[in-house]
């Protein structure tokens, strides 16, 4: 009789699904924490918003946080720790009670110190505006280049005018070369000759007295 060995059955390896779920839960919790502002900021806002001179008590502070949508019951321990840390830093002053139980008020020195850096930022913003306006200066230099280009045109005009004057100068030379008038001067002796010929005309005038004498003789005959 042949004996048959029993077949070895291999069990499947267990799939670890639980660690992946834990990671997703942790990531979701981290996202929830990151969405809201820290407790210290919420406490400082609530204390600064209150108008009570004696400070804000713990129950009044919890009411203000609950009105802002903060879960006070789950984060009760965080509120107390936040109050203690703010008092130790000096941002809050505890007017009544000890520890987390009591009334709290904003420190005026810290509030004024926070306001000063804001004023510095505004001054820096004003200083940045002139830096933005400085690139406009190169545009003015481009305008200056245009004026430099125009100046050669002005230099050309006087040169052209000088050429015109030179061209006109030959006319003056022609006017100076009018010695033709000197040639007319020999005509003047002719006028002298005409004056010399006038005594010839005076000879007939001497005959006039003779005619008068003839008239007198005729009158005597009558």
Swiss-Prot record:
InterPro entries: H1/H5, Histone_H1/H5_H15, WH-like_DNA-bd_sf, WH_DNA-bd_sf. One of its GO terms (cellular component) is heterochromatin. The keyword DNA-binding applies. The keyword Phosphoprotein applies. The modification Phosphothreonine is found at residues 35, 134, 151. Transmembrane segments: none annotated. Residues 20-34, 118-129, 136-157, 165-183, 190-222 have a biased composition (Basic residues). Pfam families: Linker_histone. Residues 1-55, 94-222 are annotated as: Disordered. Interacts with MSX1. The C-terminal domain is required for high-affinity binding to chromatin. This is Histone H1.5. It comes from Rattus norvegicus (Rat). The lineage of its organism: Eukaryota, Metazoa, Chordata, Craniata, Vertebrata. The gene is H1-5.
